[in-house]
A protein has these predicted regions:
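Short helix-loop-beta connector
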Residues: 52-57, 105-109, 113
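Active-site-facing substrate-recognition patch
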Residues: 1-56
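Acidic, divalent-metal-coordinating active-site segment for phosphoryl/phosphodiester hydrolysis
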Residues: 117-124
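A generic local structural motif
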Residues: 45-47, 69, 97-100, 126-130
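PRPP-dependent phosphoribosyltransferase catalytic core
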Residues: 12, 16, 128-188
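Short, glycine/charge-rich flexible loops or terminal/linker lids adjacent to PRPP-binding catalytic cores
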Residues: 74-111, 177-187
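Conserved PRPP/pyrophosphate-binding segment of the phosphoribosyltransferase/PRPP-pathway fold
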Residues: 42-91
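Short catalytic-loop micro-motif centered on adjacent basic/acidic residues
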Residues: 58-61, 113, 139-143
Length: 188
């Protein structure tokens, strides 16, 4: 069924995710550095299924940290006007400049944001602002792992942004290594 792929994702996070001080969840072993192609395909299919009603024609992502869901292209020197925003990533602990060429994004585009993590929502907020500035329509955001105990998800949803997170971590304990996912007890 549709849940299988995401159960696999949660199992992988439980098995291979490392909890570090300061609410950091390391999933480099399968999300960032060593891409698990099967898992990525499952993730891609799930996003496609969830946003099937939305006629997405553009996908915007930030510093795809090795994420194969949205293919990363080499940065070219962009001629002409660009949209730009600075965002601070909680997950990666640094500030990014996001630059999108105006010829890439505009009226009539239906844009889906994709990111590996949603923590405090700064990165996605920056991307959402670019979409808004361009006159394109923001269809929503597809997140692989949302930290439900941080403010990002609630903030973005409160702004009316459709956020689809494949795994929502409600709590994680550095000492015991325990990760609790939303909906663990009940299937929503």
């Amino acid at each position: 069924g549709t849940e299988d792929g995401m159960k696999e994702l949660k199992d992988r996070i439980r098995r291979d995710g490392k909890i570090k001080a300061g609410n950091v969840l390391k999933v480099d072993s399968f999300l960032n550095h060593q891409m698990d192609i099967k898992l990525f395909e499952a993730i891609g299919r799930e996003f496609k299924r969830r946003f099937a009603d939305a006629e997405v024609n553009k996908i915007l992502t930030i510093e795809a940290s090795g994420i194969g869901i949205a293919k990363k292209t080499e940065t070219k020197n962009i001629a002409g006007e660009v949209y730009t925003t600075k965002v601070e990533s909680f997950t990666h602990g640094r500030i990014y400049d996001i630059i999108v060429s105006k010829e890439f994004l505009g009226k009539g585009d239906k844009v889906l944001l994709i990111d590996d993590f949603l923590a405090n929502g700064n990165a996605l907020e920056g991307l959402a602002q670019i979409v808004k500035d361009s006159g394109a329509e923001l269809v929503g955001a597809g997140i692989v792992i949302e930290k439900g105990f941080q403010v990002g998800g609630d903030m973005l949803r409160a702004k009316g942004i459709r956020v689809e997170s494949l795994a929502i971590v409600d709590s994680m304990d550095e000492k015991t290594g325990t990760i609790v996912f939303r909906g663990d007890d009940s299937d929503e």
